[in-house]
């Protein structure tokens, strides 16, 4: 009887030792596989071009992230505001500390010191070439000039809307505008644009494709020109390319972190006459002009009401960046 018990105990011991050996062997094999796999990953990773879908987002044509209109009472606590003004304002004020004064006045409206940036520009035409709107909210002051109404309205149309633009090779191709949202935008020191409409046989309608002097001139020596032609018709285009670039652009919608304040003038410029522009006069406003200090006082006093008509954006507009998007 004792022999049977000893034999049973011995069998259990042997099985236990065998099982322990098997488990240790499996553990060593798994460790070997795991370490070799990790080593393989470390070696191969530098040679693999993987995409981070959270960073490399596809281009949709909009430089900005859409947000709803601001509903909080103090969006400025975490936001920046850029105020663009003509240099003649500085000349008239003639005070080296005027910006510090304005900063203190903005502080009374809840805008912390350092959150408001004052940026000057020479004139509307020059500003049109390279508008750079870097802040969460951007307010552009444009002094009314009867001789520059076209420049003012085109600049407003440019910065109050988002555009998706492609380069145009006018030496090789004909171009047509597909719908009312499709425009040709030209920028440069001097832009003269001529067009020749073509029939179905690519022959000029009232012009010769080989003679640019017969083309129809739609813009002359402008710094910013937004050209609108008859949709669905091919055109041969001539542009002063040495001093101007032209892009085929599509209006995507309003750029709601920008407001234009017209300073002076009997009437406010109306860019909503364009059927592709949704009514947005709340971001195209007018203030009376007497002295520039009066203008800035008015802006400070009503800045928060102006902001309520806008939407904060997370990205900036640099015309060089937006203009070369494809």
Swiss-Prot record:
Ca(2+) 1 binds at residues 95, 206, 214, 216. N-glycosylated. Disulfide bonds join 82-135, 165-249, 191-244, 196-207. Gene3D superfamilies: Glycoprotein VP7, domain 1 (3.40.50.11130), Rotavirus outer-layer protein VP7, domain 2 (2.60.120.800). InterPro entries: VP7, VP7_1, VP7_2. Glycans are attached at residues 69, 238. Homotrimer; disulfide-linked. 2 Ca(2+) ions bound at each subunit interface in the trimer hold the trimer together. Interacts with the intermediate capsid protein VP6. Interacts with the outer capsid protein VP5*. Belongs to the rotavirus VP7 family. This is Outer capsid glycoprotein VP7. It comes from Rotavirus A (isolate RVA/Cow/Thailand/A5/1988/G8P6[1]). The lineage of its organism: Viruses, Riboviria, Orthornavirae, Duplornaviricota, Resentoviricetes.
């Amino acid at each position: 009887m004792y022999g049977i018990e000893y034999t049973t105990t011995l069998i259990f011991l042997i099985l236990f030792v065998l099982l322990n050996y098997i488990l240790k062997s499996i553990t060593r094999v798994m460790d070997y596989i795991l370490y070799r796999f990790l080593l393989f990953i470390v070696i191969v990773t530098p040679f693999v071009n993987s995409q981070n879908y959270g960073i490399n987002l596809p281009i949709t044509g909009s430089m900005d992230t859409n947000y709803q209109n601001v509903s909080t009472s103090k969006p400025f606590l975490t936001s920046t505001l850029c105020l663009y003004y003509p240099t003649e304002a500085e000349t008239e004020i003639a005070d080296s500390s005027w910006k510090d004064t304005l900063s203190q006045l903005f502080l009374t409206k809840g805008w912390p010191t350092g959150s408001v940036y004052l940026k000057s520009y020479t004139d509307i035409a020059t500003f049109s070439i390279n508008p750079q709107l870097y802040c969460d909210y951007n307010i552009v002051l444009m002094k009314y000039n009867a001789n520059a109404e076209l420049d003012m309205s085109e600049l407003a149309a440019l910065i109050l809307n988002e555009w998706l633009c492609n380069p145009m090779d006018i030496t090789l191709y004909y171009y047509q505008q597909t719908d009312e949202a499709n425009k040709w935008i030209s920028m440069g020191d001097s832009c003269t644009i001529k067009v020749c409409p073509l029939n179905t046989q690519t022959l000029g309608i009232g012009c010769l494709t080989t003679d640019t002097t017969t083309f129809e001139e739609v813009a002359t020596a402008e710094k910013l020109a937004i050209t609108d032609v008859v949709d669905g018709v091919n055109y041969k285009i001539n542009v002063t390319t040495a001093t101007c670039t032209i892009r085929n652009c599509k209006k995507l919608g309003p750029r709601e972190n920008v407001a234009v304040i017209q300073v002076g003038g009997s009437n406010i410029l109306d860019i909503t006459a364009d059927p592709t522009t949704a009514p947005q006069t709340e971001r195209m406003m007018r203030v009376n002009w007497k002295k520039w200090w009066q203008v800035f006082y008015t802006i400070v006093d009503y800045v928060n009401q102006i902001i309520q008509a806008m939407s904060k954006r997370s990205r900036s507009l640099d015309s060089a960046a937006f203009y070369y998007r494809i």
